[in-house]
Amino acid sequence: MKTNSWGTGILVAMVLLVESAGGEGLSPTTPKEQCSLAVVSRLLQTDIPVCDGAVVQRMASSGHAFEQNQLGIASVLAVGPDYSEKEALDWFTQAAQRGYAPAQVNLAVMYSNGWGTPANYGAAQHWLRAAAEQGFARAYFNLGVLYLEGHGVRRDSAEAFRWFQTGAESGDSGAQTNLGYMYDLGLGCAKNPATAAAWYTKAALAGNPLGENNLADMYLRGEGVPQDDSAAFSWFQKAAAQGHTGARIKLGYMYAQGRGTAKDPLAAYSWITAAALAGDPRGGDLLYSLERSLSAEQKAQAKQQASTLRRSDPQLSATGFAQ
């Protein structure tokens, strides 16, 4: 699927890693990340039983909104000739018009990204509000992103904060992460590191990789929580295990420096290489430094480990389609 500034599921709010002179240390002012339009979540891992495709197709064609939404997801995630943004848009539209809130959010994602249709932020906002009126937490989160980023609406941090707060209190881990981000930076509210850390913790405990990454960063810097390299390392590990490249880079730095763990240049090289293989080059300076300290055999071993990590990545949602 083509992507744009919203569609990756993760918006890097600013440069993640600020290296000190010579690349020797992690910056104490490392910024955080925020979740973008679609909630970061695992794809197709729900409590919904797997049904026969012909049955789903028949029920969708008969007007069942749940199955229409599932076929929309299947169409947009398909590989090869079965991939069809237009077909996904059609299924989401049918389910959304029947009042199915997850499909309304998914249709908004399609409109906001211009997938299967010209981009239309007004239509995206319309469907998000329809889902929000039904109390669907992901809609609150996505409306917050609209106002935070100023897409189709006037940029308004206070309004974004209000939507994130509603979503966070409804249990949406993306909204919890972003509410923490707002408190962390003082956007739409007074800056409050302790409250930021509390919301990051809720999101992290729910398994949100950005929440895990941002909480790790709080522990690394001792903001809102006591400084604790071991806790930072542990949370970076959890986010890295979910494929979060920024966490992988920071994990590499911690292994390289022996912070929160035993010093392990080979592991550092593996994690940063895994991030680079995923398209994130921000650990390049440390990677270059480590290359000079590892033997050819060690580098080959580390690269093999990085390739294994990359192949075994859990599939993170690039679009956060609601099910």
Predicted regions: what they are:
Residues 61-64, 77-79, 84, 97-100, ...:
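Short helix-capping/linker turns of helical repeat alpha-solenoids
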Residues 74, 95, 110, 131, ...:
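TPR/TPR-like alpha-solenoid repeats
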Residues 69, 105, 126, 141, ...:
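TPR/TPR-like alpha-solenoid signature
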Residues 45-54, 82-91, 118-130, 154-166, ...:
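Structural signature of tandem alpha-helical TPR/SEL1-like repeats
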Residues 9-19:
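Bacterial N-terminal signal peptides
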Residues 21-76, 317-323:
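N-terminal leader/linker segments that initiate helical-solenoid repeat arrays
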Residues 281-323:
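Terminal, low-structured helical/coil segments at or just beyond the last alpha-helical repeat
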Residues 41, 70-77, 81, 106-113, ...:
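Hydrophobic face of amphipathic alpha-helices that form TPR/SEL1-like repeat modules
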